[in-house]
């Protein structure tokens, strides 16, 4: 589209070198004048290489990193003071902890003594009940045994005696009655025979008495009278009655055994009551540890060495950042200088486009002023065959890489790079925190070790007192139990011996001695033997053993709080109840690192937002281009496409009119900028209006009178129809 404007005084785009040539002829404008120029030459440009954006950004990053390092050093200095203060607090707390046995032992000693006294009191009651129960059980058992077997013995012996007496009486009665009857019959027969014989003798005596003398008479009646009085001796009945009357009643055994058994038990109960009724544990035998004072902060290089190492890291990092960034800022001048040389050469080459009428002068100015972004746009546009789309692609790239947009992008990248440098420094510091944690852990270990030593010493002394109590009770109480069990065993032996003696005295010379002894061994002897074995077991196991105090009575909780198995870091005795770290000292360092990390995070977010602004700006250009990319191009009849700019010859003042054309020449791909189709026919241009006076400045030129040309310039935008982009 052509714009008609009245003539006005303007500063020409291309200064008319030699416009006041005294010869009045038209001169060729030099592309690289050797004299003084109003624009910067190559040497002038190279003299400002160190002011390039990358060097400035790197120096800004360096300044931000140095500020961060200084802030970290200041924060670490404060953290060191707080850590030393916390160490002093931990030292005081550790001293209080290792002195806790001094205070706790008094209560624990009282608890231990009271526990022993209550145990002894319960032991006394239990012993008395046990002794009484065992006493009665043994007596009951023995009485049941010998009274049961007494009944058995009585039944057997008395039954046998009664049977024998009956048999003897029957035999005596039978013998007495039978012998007398036989004696009487014999007596009668003998008397008859004797009478006859005596008569016969009398007759003989009468005849032969003169010759032989007198024959004696037969007299056996006296002998027969003895037969009449024949009977069994009465001693048989008396012997059997003696056996019957001599069966033992075990009254003596009962009385003897009862007295013997009750004597040791009653003696034991008397001794137990006398010894344990007023038993009091000797509390003075339990020790009370002395107070302790720890001092591991003074003269300890743990905290100082940690913060010295952190200071060394920050100093080293600062030196490295200064060296690297300054070297990078200096080295970046080399490619920037080389870039300026190439840009200068490219500008000289492309400045010739101003003399050609096939190029849009604004495009030429853009290509010359922004060679790299313009070249990128040209390369990206070469993928499209449509000139409209080629121009849109170049426009998008130009929109996204405009100086304001590039400033925003570079600012965002510089901020992100600064955050990266600070993050590297932060991680270098955080890697040293475990060393401080280890050192603080050693502090806790020192406290626990001291506490364990105190606890172990106290436990050893207390256990010694408890062991003495065990020995005393075992000697004075269970010694009596051992004595009583031995006495009971002796009593049972006496019982067995006495019972066996009674049985031997009773049945020793009778046929019942063997069976009675066997019955006794089977029914009583085996039971007594079992009881003796039980009493022997009681004798071997009757002793008291109070549990001893562990060596870590006062240190177990502290040791568990710093052990690896502790799942909650706030359980550490070096931490407060609401702390999330294992101790106060490392919490100070973590607070500093968290603060720095929060600052880095904030700066990262700000840089990301700035980068997002550039992305949004680029997306706006992309969306605008896409809206035109797919829309149909309007024809001239629809209001699109202005008339071609006519070629204007140079005027008498030496200005060169560059015609504006809008249609590219797709056949020209070797040019640094797209060519447009052939020039339109020349149009007569009125130059009646003179140029206004304009002072050129310090170049020493005179004021130029330039005639305004109404059709010299059109719109400064790339035009498609009536649209401007």
Curated annotation (Swiss-Prot):
Cytoplasmic side: 75-136, 340-394, 624-725
GO biological process per UniProt: plasma membrane fusion involved in cytogamy
Residues modified by glycosylation: 176, 244, 273, 278, 482, 489, 504, 551
Keywords: Cell membrane, Conjugation, Glycoprotein, Membrane, Transmembrane, Transmembrane helix
GO cellular component: mating projection tip; plasma membrane
Main subcellular location of this protein, as a coarse class: membrane
Extracellular side: 1-53, 158-318, 418-602
Membrane topology per record: Multi-pass membrane protein
InterPro entries: PRM1
Family: Belongs to the PRM1 family.
Function: Involved in cell fusion during mating by stabilizing the plasma membrane fusion event.
PANTHER family linked: PLASMA MEMBRANE FUSION PROTEIN PRM1 (PTHR31030:SF1)
Name this polypeptide is given: Plasma membrane fusion protein prm1
Organism expressing this protein natively: Aspergillus terreus (strain NIH 2624 / FGSC A1156)
